[in-house]
Amino acid sequence: KLGMREAEQFYLQDLLYALMLNSDNDAAVMIAEQVGGSVEGFTEKMNLKAREIGCEDTYFITPNGLDAENENGIHSTTAEDLARILRYCIMESPKKEDFLAITRMPSYTFWNYSKTQVYQCTNHNAFLGMMDGALTGKTGFTGNAGYCYVGALQWEGKTLIVSLLACGWPNNRGYKWEDTRKLMTYGLTNYEY
């Protein structure tokens, strides 16, 4: 949580850094309310985009990935759909360069719009420093899902994406990094395309 105060204003770009580097849930809600008119309006757009890019087993209720349920189901996805979303973000999106710039930034500092409060974000994606060719990724955690990660690597013309769900619960937050490294190494060694 970024710890925004009521009526505070921010630039969208700064909120995107807070969301993607710190996983600040309040930044996700603020973006959703401004871009979609409401959380519900934004998640409707998220669900439409997910279907458009081929995600058939994903249903978003929250803009931040937190556990939720409504009359239509539970907030859920699959490892395959998360990989498909990351593929879109790094290979197909018209904003792919912006996405990569944000998700690869080691840290980011910004002020609120009125310049009365400064905020600091730190990239928690340890995979970026683990392997040559590590491109990007996003961490996540909920009580139901455990630690999750989706990451990409580019090496010798190959782009590999690893998606991990339920990869440990506290005190095992580091499992995802070793599992990602092993899967990426396996893919580089054994996968041809």
What function would you assign to each model-found segment?
Residues 55-56, 73-193:
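Domain-terminus/edge residues, biased toward the C-terminal soluble/receptor-binding domains
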